[in-house]
Amino acid sequence: YGVCLDYAHAALSKVAPEEWAKRLGRYVKHVHINDNDLVSDLHLAWGDGKINRQVFYDSYDKYMSKASVLVETSSYENKRRSFEVLKKEGFI
């Protein structure tokens, strides 16, 4: 079995998102990413909010590297911009 870690939801919790990744990492089969303002679940393009992307990349590489990733944004344009950031930052 496994779990889906919604990283944007984790970023809104009282527990640091990298702690979620560390504790659940061996069970994480799938990850949802998008950005937010650390207050509300906005489904912004990756890079348009306040989530620390480098912490995500490091956590993914260390704890969840075999998990699939879904860019879960509110529009096609936000997905396109997210992929541009992910490519520019070397994640994909």
Question: What is the predicted role of each segment?
Answer:
Residues Y1-L5, A10-I92:
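Histidine-acidic metal/acid-base catalytic patches
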